[in-house]
Amino acid sequence: QTMTIKGTVDKTAISLFLLIIAGYYSYTITSPTLMIGGFIAGFITALITIFNKKSAPITAPLYAIFEGLALGGISYMYAQQFEGIVLNAVSLTALILLSLLMAYRSGLIKPTENFKLGVVAATGGIFLIYLISFIGSFFGMDLALLNPANGSMFSIIFSLIVILIASLNLVLDFDFIEEASENGAPKYMEWYAALSLIHISEPT
């Protein structure tokens, strides 16, 4: 059996369902341990999937559950500080996903090689910034740029850039799914693509 677009959509729907159920559970019991454990387990599961794609039928559903636990906990924390932020984040994510899918299918956005290189490079740059911030936090260094809650215009602009780059990564996923399906990729790649989609689509 080979990968199909319909199969990928089905696997993505299953993954989202698992993520939502786990997220709701984590949101209601408000356990910091569960939230942190979800982040760590999700990260490890994602790494396993990246280096062993054949494991995706097992690791992708697990990743969805772990990330649901993590996102449910962090959503509760933000909801206590900023009223309505969780609903707004979920709504914005859904609108971005739908809009980009329509733009991709209509040909308005074409993932050329330069486009792909640019998105990958920008994503890598953002990752490095967050990595430096994470390491710096152990030494008392705080990058205010990464905190839009401080009201700084630079922080807000940076956050918008991060959202834009994360959104453009969805276009790369759409292109990958279409090409892989046309080229007869193995069936397990449906789960791999589903993991990639839910990872990028997570509200931030």
Functional labels for PLM-detected ranges:
Residues 23-32, 51-54:
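Short, hydrophobic transmembrane alpha-helix segments
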Residues 44-57, 100-111, 174-176:
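C-terminal ends of transmembrane helices
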Residues 64-77, 120-131:
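Small-residue-rich segments of transmembrane alpha-helices in multi-pass membrane proteins
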Residues 198-204:
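Residue-level detector of conserved catalytic or cofactor/ligand-binding positions
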Residues 178-197:
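Interfacial loop-to-transmembrane junctions
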Residues 30-40, 83-95, 156-166:
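Structural signature of hydrophobic alpha-helical transmembrane segments
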Residues 2-8, 182:
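Cytosolic juxtamembrane amphipathic/interface segments immediately preceding
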Residues 58-67, 87-91, 113-123:
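Cytoplasmic-side transmembrane-helix entry/capping segments in multi-pass membrane proteins
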